[in-house]
Amino acid sequence: KTAIILEDDCLPTKEFFCFINLMLKRYKNNKKISSICGSNHLSTWKSSDSSYLISKYFNSWGWATWQDRWQKVDFDNKNLLKVVNNHKFIHHIGSYRALFYWRYILKKILRNKINSWAYTYNYFNFIKKKYHIIPTQNLINNVGIGIKSTNTKVLPVKYFFSKLKLNKTTSFSFKHDKYNFNKYDTAVEDIIFSKSLINRIKW
């Protein structure tokens, strides 16, 4: 069984559904893939001829998954904290910059400063070394972004989401990607993770 999840402020292109359904079929037996995402927070990413890429970062704005993957997710953040505080977590997350950031976010979740299931879902997939399919062109327009929003106001909207554009004329050749995600993930991290030493000391 599969499910496509669209929140009320996420507007998809017509290509979104074609993309999601094709990827669900292609990766249904690949347990390393946890979800299919419709949004690309860099708006467009073209490092190869493929129409999608594989990333360690999950995007919750228009996505899909399989029942067997979803049922295995542990949403107990206290259990996650034990793992994240373990020095071996660096092997799951890839860099100390990412490690300090995600520890900081998890502590804010445990103090009820952030209320988002998507962060917990990301942590679980980090630990289990699961990945996500991301389209090389964005297929979702989130009309709920702003200072009054529930979650996005805590993110670097000016530098991150301002670049997110809806590609209405997107067409896919469906040339398939390999596990070749380092450059995309690094580009996402360069935007999400502050380069300010003062801000990073807070982590």
List where the protein language model places each region.
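An acidic/histidine-cluster motif and surrounding catalytic segment
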Residues: K1-I5, C10-W203
